[in-house]
A protein has these predicted regions:
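Switch/connector loops and helix/strand junctions flanking conserved nucleotide-binding motifs
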Residues: 19-20, 85-87, 106-112, 160-163
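ATP-dependent small-molecule kinase phosphotransfer cores
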Residues: 14-75, 79-81
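Short glycine-/polar-rich loops that comprise or flank the Walker A/P-loop
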Residues: 5-7, 92-97, 145-149
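Conserved catalytic network of the ASCE P-loop NTPase/AAA+ motor domain
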Residues: 21, 66-71, 89-94, 142-144
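Conserved phosphate-donor/acceptor-positioning beta-strand/loop module used by diverse small-molecule
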Residues: 74-80, 91-116
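Short beta-strand-centered segment that lines the nucleotide-binding/catalytic pocket of NTP-utilizing
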Residues: 2-19
Length: 175
């Protein structure tokens, strides 16, 4: 969170196991399928995706849990093209500015492998599945269909990329 820029994290939910170095409520809210069912029954699910992983089904979802107050703050979140389109439908196009962060495939795979090696029990098959699924989910055609035109390169440092994003968001707020 950067108070000077009023850019707050928008944290999604997942049923996947927490990885080494992650913190509940920072990268994701880590919940079980029972909690997901409760949120479904309460009508709180904005969007939901299920991935058939090597370890079984994992759900990623966005819930209307009160963390978003568009009248007071701007938010930065991570998601797929599918989740972006559903969030845009829920909050309204005027509330959403897509920021597409792209990374060279070789670098993305290298970073994923480095991250996976640090896990207590690395799951390389799942890492490969995720990489290939992302290649399918983020084709140029699908990016264009989602109406995303602005891209940010994350081929150098994450700090450089985030600084570029912050500057872009500031310019958008002035429009």
């Amino acid at each position: 969170r950067d108070p000077a820029r009023d850019l707050n994290p928008f944290v999604l939910y997942t049923t996947r196991p927490i990885r080494s170095g992650e913190q509940d409520g920072r990268e994701y809210f880590f919940v079980d399928e029972k909690r997901l069912s409760e949120l479904r029954e309460a009508g709180k699910i904005i969007e939901e995706r299920m991935y058939s992983t090597v370890q079984g089904p994992w759900y990623y979802f966005t819930a209307d849990d009160g963390q978003i107050d568009l009248a007071k703050h701007d938010y930065l979140g991570i998601g797929t093209l599918e989740s972006y389109l559903k969030l845009k439908a829920y909050f309204g196009e005027q509330a959403m500015v897509p920021l597409y962060v792209e990374v060279d495939d070789g670098l993305r795979l290298s970073r994923a492998l480095e991250r996976e090696r640090k896990q207590t029990e690395p799951k390389y098959a799942e890492m490969c599945r995720r990489f290939l699924a992302d290649c399918e989910d983020f084709t140029e055609e699908k990016i264009a269909e989602a109406g995303i035109v602005r891209r940010f390169s994350n081929n150098s440092t994450p700090e450089d990329c985030f600084s570029e994003i912050q500057n872009f968001v500031e310019q958008q707020k002035k429009l």
